[in-house]
Amino acid sequence: MMPADHSPSAPSWRRVEIALIGTARRLRYAFDHRLAELDLNLNQASLLAFVNDFGGTNQTELAELVGVGRASCGAMIDQLEARGLVTRNPDPHDRRVWLVGITDEGSALVQRFYAVDECFRQEIRHGISREERQQLAALLERLGTNVDAILQTPNPQEKSSVSGRSE
């Protein structure tokens, strides 16, 4: 592990964080821009791909996989169902649950999505060496570990707001 660079020429953490968050936001926007030719956004394409790859899945599982709330997922399923891309079928093991399946038209659209996805990924990787990719992956994994640790600890501000006073 390399020692932290605290020299004046090292970028500030604020600059790094702004770059990371801004890049993630632009990446999402660019992906949605590319998927517009399929009349999909990234969440819809992801949902279709999960259903295509894993078969009948319920709305709760799909919401978790896509990273959206159940209500948002339900609205997406409604939109995709109206377009004839997915179906809702009763779960044979639990009559309260509906499983989302994919139609032939939906499966064909997923194949087009995979082609757009592969092309897009090649474009964003342009000019980044293997060594740079390894460094980036290691740093992002370390940041992810730090974020996971934060999520496992109580928020100190929540404690003070619950009691009505700060400590």
For every predicted segment, state its role.
Residues 1-38, 166-167:
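N-terminal leader segment of winged-helix/HTH proteins
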Residues 54-58:
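Short capping segments at the starts of secondary-structure elements
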Residues 21, 49-53, 114, 141:
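Short, locally clustered residues in the helix-turn-helix/winged-helix DNA-binding domain
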Residues 1-10, 130-167:
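C-terminal regulatory/oligomerization modules of transcriptional regulators
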Residues 14-18, 38-49, 74:
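Short alpha-helical elements of helix-turn-helix
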Residues 28, 78-141, 145:
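Charged, amphipathic alpha-helical coiled-coil/dimerization segments
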Residues 69-72:
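Helix-turn-helix DNA-binding motif, specifically the short coil turn and the N-cap/start of the second
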Residues 63:
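The alpha-helix within a helix-turn-helix
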